[in-house]
């Protein structure tokens, strides 16, 4: 902790600032999908040491990538009410120091990923390459399609977690990757609808801002249909035995479809807030259901 205080600006709590820099809630969800990906693949036949290495690798690569994203987006964050109190915009840590910490975490995380197996390393590296150069630098400020690319970065922890057990890509691993990617788009578009003025003021070309709120709802609705399809495909790949996944994922998806169909005729800010809150636990619940099915199938 003393070392951490040395790289932060005076007057701020080191743990709080680092938690803010690494967007700890979002990072925890990505770490959870990665660990659950490993558990889904292995059921009860996992290696505790691999699980520990994977947890460390996921934590460091996700923290490092997230921190670099915060460094590059600090100017945008300073313009939005929702984000202007983040660590860098409020002056709790400089961009240079934040970048240094983030790069160190990323490099160590990728090194540990490689120790697990090559495919876990590839997943971690792809997560960084998609999120930072492609999403943050090249497309976020230019096109509303940026979040579609960014979503695949968010799916890499689950993809890598699954391959930590299998040692190679599988159709099931791809299902997890794509499920996270499409969920993240539906989720963020409803966040944008709720915080519409913030995104408009910052000049970020998100779908609801560029094409209209109805287009944002329609885009989210299409992605939920894709999520439902992925649940059905996973059920088939599991030999028609993943009943918990089918019931949980099917119910949540159909409920979201019902809600979003109503929003095509208009959605209030409060309704958008309730919907993205409903979307928030979707991934965790579906992944837990998949793990239960994996255990029951043994």
Predicted segments with their positions:
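Intramembrane alpha-helical segments
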Residues: 95-165
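Hydrophobic alpha-helical transmembrane segments in multi-pass integral membrane proteins
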Residues: 159-169, 227-234, 282-298
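C-terminal ends of transmembrane helices
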Residues: 130-144, 188, 194, 205, ...
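Multi-pass membrane catalytic core of lipid/isoprenoid biosynthesis enzymes
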Residues: 82-122, 212-238
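Membrane-embedded alpha-helical segments that form the functional core of polytopic membrane enzymes
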Residues: 32-74, 81-82, 106, 110, ...
